[in-house]
C-alpha cells in the first residue's frame, strides 16, 4: 500500500511539473502578443515619417517657429495620438514630436528593445537638425 501511495504521488508531481513546464513554454512564445497590444488611434494629426533600420516610424507633430522641441514616446501599448491635444495646449511655445513605437499608430515593424534604441536615436537626430533645445 505504501508503494502505491508513493507511485501515485510521483505521478501526480510529474503531471504537475509537466503542466507547469507547458504553461511556461506557452507564456514564453506568447509574450510578445501579451506585452505589445496596439490601441486604436484617437484622431488624425499632422505627422512625419522617419526611417530607422528600414522601418517607417510615425511621429505626430505640432510645429511652429519655436527653437525648442519636446520628444515623447508613449507607454506600453499606447498610441501617442491620445496626448497630442494635451501637449499642444500645455506647451504652446514648443514644437511637439510624439513618437509611435514600431507596430503602433502607423509605424511599421515589430517593437523590440534594440529597435526602440535605434528609433530613439533616429528621431533625436532628425529633431536635432533643427532644434537647439530638446526635452
PLM features: residue spans?
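Glycine-centered tight beta-turn/hairpin loop motif at sheet-sheet or coil-to-beta transitions
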Residues: 52-56
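A generic structural signal for short, solvent-exposed coil/turn residues
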Residues: 27, 41-44, 51, 65, ...
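Membrane-embedded segments
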Residues: 57-130
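Alpha/beta-hydrolase fold nucleophile elbow
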Residues: 131-135
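N-terminal membrane-anchoring alpha-helices
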Residues: 1-49
Amino acid at each position: 500500500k505504501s508503494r502505491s501511495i508513493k507511485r501515485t504521488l510521483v505521478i501526480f508531481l510529474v503531471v504537475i511539473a509537466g503542466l507547469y513546464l507547458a504553461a511556461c513554454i506557452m507564456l514564453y512564445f506568447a509574450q510578445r502578443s501579451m506585452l505589445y497590444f496596439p490601441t486604436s488611434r484617437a484622431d488624425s494629426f499632422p505627422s512625419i515619417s522617419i526611417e530607422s533600420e528600414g522601418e517607417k516610424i510615425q511621429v505626430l507633430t505640432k510645429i511652429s517657429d519655436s527653437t525648442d522641441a519636446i520628444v515623447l514616446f508613449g507607454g506600453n501599448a499606447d498610441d501617442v495620438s491620445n496626448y497630442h491635444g494635451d501637449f499642444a495646449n500645455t506647451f504652446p511655445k514648443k514644437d511637439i514630436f510624439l513618437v509611435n513605437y514600431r507596430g503602433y499608430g502607423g509605424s511599421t515593424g515589430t517593437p523590440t528593445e534594440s529597435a526602440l534604441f535605434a528609433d530613439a536615436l533616429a528621431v533625436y537626430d532628425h529633431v536635432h537638425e533643427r532644434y537647439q533645445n530638446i526635452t
